[in-house]
Amino acid sequence: RTEQLAIMKNAQFIVQPSLCEGWGTVLEDAKVLNKVVLLSNIPVHQEQQNKKCVLFDPHDPKQLAETIARTAERASLPEHEAEYAGDMEQGIANMYREAREYSRALERVFL
């Protein structure tokens, strides 16, 4: 797990090509690291995604290859360096913000 997180921290972006997931911890780790994530377009990823996620058809390898190429090209541009660098402090702040929003939504429904 430590090695996996170190690799993710130093990656320009993460690819999660699953056909089936319960609740993807790779995506949650990537969100904390504030990384761009390419996700297979499956229900759990639709639910978990944030602004830094890009969905692709998990049954279309050509689309995945094109999405990876486009993302790698964008990540190599100096004007997008910060977007792909990842910032754990910002990622944690985003998670806290999302948790507060979720908590408020629950309060509106149940209180």
Label each PLM-derived region with a short phrase:
Residues 19:
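Aromatic "clamp/platform" in nucleotide-sugar-dependent glycosyltransferases that forms part
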